[in-house]
Every structure is written in structure tokens, then in C-alpha cells.
Amino acid sequence: TVQPVVPGEGADITGADFLFMGAGTERAQRFAAEDFARYSATVKAAAEDGTAMLFAGTAMELLGASVTDRDGDTYPGIGLASFTTVQGKRRIVGDVYGVTALFPEAVVGFMNKCGQIRGVEAPLLTGLSLGFGTGRTCSPLSSPGQFW
């Protein structure tokens, strides 16, 4: 059974088999953060129990300690992890193709964001042959290294 969670209405997500939160604009993210905070303890408990989760784009940023918007205002994430996000004025849009220690095959994705993730000690993507890595200002084709 799929249970939609409507902002402002609340829902009991305890015991969910799968949690999904889709991406939105940076402006919508701030409003979502206020509502999402009520689920902090439940999401953390679900993560500890091994519940499968998919948080895309700006939704994933809410799992960290905080988000600082392009104007310099900071608001809290739920603190599932200690990373922070700092949003800039430049939007990076494009395909991503890279490798990770999580899977034997390459991974393919799409990026549409203006936030840089900071404080991730073990990068998820260890090689990138197409696209931009988080926190980088240049293409990996001219600057090889670790990404995201």
C-alpha cells in the first residue's frame, strides 16, 4: 500500500517498508524542511532498522545537519547524517556517469542542483567520466579525483 504524505497533514510512517521523497525546487525545499522535521525520529529509526529509502535531489539534502540557502540563511535538516549543504547561485544541470565501490557496474544519473554537499568523508562516486562532482567547480575531465 502506498501512503502519500501531504505537507501539513502528518502521517504515521512507522513500520514503512520503503520511504521515498522526491526532489523539488530550493524554495520548496525550505518549506518541506519545516514539515519534514516532524518525521525526524521516525526516519532515523527506520534507517537504523535497515528500511529501504530513496531521497532524490533536494530531498536528500534534508537528511543532513543543515542547508544554507543562496542568501546565507541556514535551516536545519533532520540530522540523519552530519553533512551540510550550501546552495549557490549557479545551477548545474546534466547527465552523470561514474563508478562507485557500491556496485561493480558504472552508474548513470542526472543532476539538476545548485547545492554543494560538504562533510561527506567517504565519497559515493570515486570516478566520474561525465558530469560534475559535488563541491567541484570544474569538470572531472579536467580535474580527476573523488566526487560526492
Which positions does each model-derived feature cover?
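Amide-donor transfer/coupling interface in amidating biosynthetic enzymes
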Residues: 87-148
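A generic local structural motif
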Residues: 4-8, 39-42, 98, 135-137
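Extended, subdomain-level signal for the structured scaffold at the beginning of enzyme domains
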Residues: 1-33
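Cysteine-nucleophile active-site neighborhood
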Residues: 24-104
